[in-house]
Amino acid sequence: MSSNIINAITGELITIDITLFISLNEFKKFLINRWQIDFNNLLLLLPFGNKINDRIFIDLIGKKNDQSTIYVFDRRLFSLVNNPDNELSSDYLTNIKNLLKGINHPTNNLNQLVKPVNSPYEEVEINEKFLNYHTITSLITTNLGWLSALEIDMHYFQIQISDTLDYIKNIIESLKICQNYLELYCYDVENLYNSNVKFLNQLANNEILKNWLNYYDNILTKLSDINGNKLSSYLNKNELVSISSKIEELDQRVNSNLKKFKIVIDKNIDLRNNINKEISSLSEKITPSSEKYKLEETMLEKFTELVKNLRNDSKVILEKDENEFDKNYMQNLAKSLEKDKKVTVTNLLTISKALYSQANDISEIKSKLQVDSIKLFGQISFIQIETLNIKKLLLNELNKDLEKYQGFELKLAHVQDIPLVYGLYSIENYRRESWVLQINYKHLDFNKSLKTIVEKEKSTRNKWVDNFGSTAVYFTEDMDTLRDFNYLNNIAKGNQSMIKKLEELFKNISNESHNKNLVFIETYIKEVEDLDLDKDVIELFKRYLAVAQGFVIEQPSTKNIISDKETGELINGYQSRIKKLELLLHSARYSNVESWPTGLLNYSNVKLFRNNVATVNSKLSLQSDYMGNISYGSDQLRIKELENVNKQYKTDFKALTDENKLLKDKVTKFNTDISDIQIERNAYKETLTKLNEELSRLTSIEGDFEKHKGEKEIELKIKIDGLVDSNKTLLNQISDLKIESKELESSNRDLLAQLNQKREEHKVLEDSLKQRENEGLRYKDEYEAKLKELTEKFEADRRALEDEIKAAKEQNMKESMEQQTEQSANQSIDQSIEQSTEQSTEQSTEQSMEQSMEQSMEQSVEQSMEHSMEHSMEQSEKQNMGQNDATIDNQSIETPTSEDMHSLDEQSPESQLLKSNTTELQPIKSQELAEDSKAIELKNIQEMLVSKLYEIFSSNVFILENIGLLLTFDEHDNFQIRRVKGLKKNLNQSVLEETGLLNEIEMPVKSDVFSEVKTLFSNYKETFDSRSYISLLSKINQLYDCKLYETAVIKRFEDIELLAKKLAKENKAKKNLFEKYRCERITLKNFEVGDLALFLPTRENCITEDVSVASWNSSFSSVDLSTPPPFGEPITNQSHSGTAKDKNKHNLEKRPWAAFTAFEETARYFLKDPENIPNNREWFVGKIMHLQRFVVEDHISNPYKLPKGAVWFQVTATVVSHQ
C-alpha cells in the first residue's frame, strides 16, 4: 500500500509503501534519514489531525487497499511561541530565519537559479570585414553550446516552477491539518469544562443549601428519640452553619474560576477562528494559479521552433567547407547572423528571462509562506499551551473544589435524612430484638430435646449390651463404653455456658421492652405524619414495621436429598431465574418514580425481610426421612460402598476428561502458532524481497548521487573562486557605503541644525513683522489725522491766499509781465492744489499731494522765467502725471533741494507758505519711509527663508531617494517613506556636493510629495500671499514634526549596517571554506612553509657535475636526478671525519626523496630525513615545516652532485598521507 508522506515546512512529498516497515520506530528512522529530523522532534499527523501512535500505525498497515497521507512536522516549528495579540519584533523574525536555516533540507540550498546569460552573438560585432572562416565557425559553435545550455535552463525552470507550486499547496494543506490537530486537542478540554459546569449545576439545583436550616428548626427540633432527646441534638448546628458558609464561598470561587476559564476558552476559540481565517486568506493570497506560472503553448512552441531553426541553420553553416566561404557568401552570412542576433537570439533570451523571473517569484512566495507558517505554528503553540494550562486547572484545582462542594452538601443532606434513617434504625432494632428472643427460645427447646434424646440412646445401648455383649467381646472390648457421648457432653456443656451468656446479654430484652419499642415506633411514625413529611417516608416506615412484626426465623428443610448433578442443574436454573428476577426488580425500582423517597438516599420499595414460615408438611417430611434412614440397616452398606466406588470412577473420568480437553486445547494452540509462524515467515520473505529491491534502487541512486556530487563539487569550487572575487568587490562597496553613510549623517545633522535655526529666526521675524504691522496701522491712523489737520489748514491758507491774489489783481491790473506771471502762477497753483487734493482724497497718501505741490512750484517758476503761460500749464500737467506715476511705482519720495528752496524763498509769499507746509510734512514722510524699508527688508528675509527651507526640503528628499527611500502619500494623505528598489538608477550622483544643491535638471526626483510642494512653492513665488505661504509651511512641517525623516534615515542605515554584517559573515564563511580548500590543495611550485607537497623517490640518470645549469634544468625535474643518494647529515662548513665518510657510504644504498615541481625549473627540493619514510612506499604527501636554501658552489655544498650554480632546498616535512 503506497502512502504519501508530506513535509509540513518544505512541502516535499514522497510516496512509499509503509508495509515495508515493521513498526512505527522503523518508519521514524526512515524519516530521520530522509529529512534530518531528530527522533524526539518528530510529530506525525493524519488528515483529520489525529496523532499517529503504534496502534494507529498498525491499523494503517492493515488497510492494504487504502491510500493514506501522513504529514510530518518538526516540533521545532512550534518552539517560537507567538501571542497573536502581540506585535512581532525584529528578533522574532531573525529567529524564524535562523530556524528555517536549521530545518530546511541541505539539498534545498542547491536550488539557486542561474540567470540566463547573453548569447555570444551579442558580445561581438558582426561585420563582414572582420569575419573569416575560423571566426565564424568558432562563433557558431560557441552559440550552439549557449543554445543547449539555454534549453537545459528552460527545462529546469519549468520543473522548478511545477515542484514549487506543489510544495506551496502541501504547506497550506499542512497548516490546515495542524489546525485540525489543535481543534481535537481543544475539544477534549472544552468537554471537560462543560462536564464540570454540568456537575456544578446539578449540585446547585439540589437546593439543600436553602432548605437545611428550615428543616433543622421545624422538623428536627420537634422529633425525639426513644430516650426523649431531640433529633437536632445529634447534629452540631454551628458546624452546619460553617459548612453552609464554606459552600457559598466554594460556589462563588468555582463560578469565578469557571468564568475565567470560559473567558480564556472563548478567547482561544476566537484565536483559532482567526487562525482559520488567516490560513484561508493565506491560501487565497499566496496559492498561485498554475496557469499564471505556465508559459503559453504558443510561446513554448515558438521557443522550440526558434531553437530548432537556429540549430539547423548553424549546423548547415558548419558542414560547409572552407572553400565555399567566398565573398558573396560571407556577405549573406553576415546579414543572416545579424538577423539571428537581433531577432532570434533576442526572442529566445526574452522568453528564458521571463521564465527565470517567474521561477524566482514563486521561490520567494514559498519562502514568505514558510515564514508565515512558522508564525502560525507559534500561534497554534501558544493556544495549545493556554489550553493545557486550563486543563491542568480543571483537573487539579477545580476538581478538588467540586469534591469539597459535594462533600459539604452531603453533610447538609444528612439534616433531611436523619428523620428517615432514625425511624428505620428504630424498626431495625425492634427486628433484632425479635430475632434474639426467638433464638433464645429455640436454644432452650433444643437443649431440652437433646437431653431427652441422649437419655433414650443410653437406654437403648444398655439393652443391646445386656442382650449381645457377652458374645460381642470377641469383636470389641468397648461396646459398653460411652466415648462417643463425650462430644455430646461437650456440646451440652457449651450450650449451658452459651445459655448463661445469652441470659446475661439479653436479660434486659423481654417482651415488655420489646412492646415498649413497638409503642415508640408507632408514636414516632405518628409524629412524623403530623409534621406533614413526605407520604412515601411514612409508607416506608409502615411497610418495614409490618415486616419486622411478622419476622420469624426460618429453619432449613431436609426434605429432598439430590445428587451432585441434579444440584448443579438446580443451581443453574435458580441462577437464571434470579437473573430474570433481578432484571424485573431493577426495572420496577427505576420505573416507579413515585415510590422514590425524598432526600439524597434512594430507598427501594421492596421488602428487606420476608416471613418464611416452615410448613407442617416439611417438618413431617423431615421426621419421616429420618426414621426411614434408621430402618435401612446393614442391607444398605453394600449400596453405599458401590456408590463410593462409582463416585470415585466418576471423579477419575472427570479428571481424565479435563486432561483430554487440556491436551486438545494445547494441540489447537500449537496449530494456531504454527499457522501464525508460517504467515509471519511469508511476510518476512515478502518484506525481505522488497527490502532487497529498495536496497538495489538506493544503491543505484547513491551511485548517481556520488557522480552528481563530484560534478557539483567541481562546479562549486569554480563558483567559490568567483564568489571570493565578488566578496572582495562587495567589501569595497560596503566600506565606500559606510563612508557615504557617515557623510550623509553629518550633512543631515548640519541641515537639521540649520533648519531649526532658520525656524527660530523665521518665528522671530514673523513676530517682529506682526508687531511692525500693528505699529504701522497705529502710525497710519496718526498720519491720516495729521494729514487731515494739515489739509484743513492748507485749505484755509489757500482761501486766504486767493483773497489776497484777488485783491492784488484788482490793485495791479496794469502792472507789467511780472504781475501777469504771478497771476499765471497763482492759477497753476490753484489747479495743482485741486489736483493734489483730489489725489490725496482718492489715495489717502501724503506723498502724492506734496510732490504735486512741489512740482507745481517748480513749473510755475520755469513758466515765469519763459514768459509762456499756456506752455507752462501743459508742461505742469504732464509732469504732474509722470511724477505721480513714478511715485506710485517706485514708492519713493523726492524732496526739494536747498537751491530750490532758496529760489522759492526769493519768490512771492505764496512760495513761503508752501515751504512751511512742506517742512511740517517731512518728519512724517521720513518715518513712513523707514517703516516701508523695514517691511521690505522683512519681506525679502521671508522670501529668502522660504527659498532656503524649500532647498533644504528638496535636498532631504533627494537624499532619501539617493539611499533608496521614496517619500509618498498613504491612503489617508499622510506622509510615508517606503523602501523602493531601483530608485537610484536615474540619479546623476549618489552624494550631495558640499558647495551647493543640484539644479532641478540635475536632480530627478520621483516623489509625488516633492511635486506637490514644488507646485506650492511656485505659486508662492508668483503671488507672495499668506495662504500659499501657510500651505507650503504646513506641507514641509509634516516631514519634520513627527521625526519621520530622521527615523527613516536612521533605520535605512541600520539596515545597511545589518546587511554589511551579514555580507561580512558570509564572506568570512566563504573565506574559511577557501582557506580549507587552499590548505587541502597540493602545491607544485614556489614552496613555502605550511604547503602540501608530493614527494617522490628520485631516479638515477647519468649526468656529470660540469654540465650547465640550463641544460640540467631543461632535462629533468626534481625527481629526475642523476646524483647518488645524499650523504645523510645536514650540510655544515666543518670538515668530514673518517666516521662521517663511512656513514655516507652506508647511506649510498638509499635513494633520496624530492618534492615534485612540475612548473618550476630553477630550484630543487630534497627531503632532509628520508629515514623516517616507511619502506616500500611509492609516494607520500607531506606538509613542509622548514626550508633551507643552498647554492652549489663547491663540493661541500653539493651532496647531490648538482651542477655548479644550481639552487636547491633542504626540506623538513611531516607525512600527511602515503602509499
UniProtKB/Swiss-Prot annotation:
Residues 864-877 have a biased composition (Basic and acidic residues). It holds the Pfam family ATG11. The lineage of its organism: Eukaryota, Fungi, Dikarya, Ascomycota, Saccharomycotina. PANTHER family: RB1-INDUCIBLE COILED-COIL, RB1-INDUCIBLE COILED-COIL PROTEIN 1. Disulfide bonds: none annotated. The gene is ATG11. Transmembrane segments: none annotated. It is a peripheral membrane protein. Involved in cytoplasm to vacuole transport (Cvt), pexophagy, mitophagy and nucleophagy. Recruits mitochondria for their selective degradation via autophagy (mitophagy) during starvation. Works as scaffold proteins that recruit ATG proteins to the pre-autophagosome (PAS), the site of vesicle/autophagosome formation. Required for the Cvt vesicles completion. This is Autophagy-related protein 11. InterPro entries: ATG11, Atg11_C, ATG17-like_dom. Homodimer. GO terms for biological process: autophagy of mitochondrion; cellular response to nitrogen starvation; cytoplasm to vacuole targeting by the Cvt pathway; pexophagy; piecemeal microautophagy of the nucleus; positive regulation of autophagosome assembly; protein localization to phagophore assembly site; protein-containing complex localization. It comes from Vanderwaltozyma polyspora (strain ATCC 22028 / DSM 70294 / BCRC 21397 / CBS 2163 / NBRC 10782 / NRRL Y-8283 / UCD 57-17) (Kluyveromyces polysporus). Keywords: Autophagy, Coiled coil, Membrane, Protein transport, Transport, Vacuole. The keyword Manganese does not apply. One of its GO terms (molecular function) is protein kinase binding. Residues 636-824, 1052-1081 form a coiled coil.
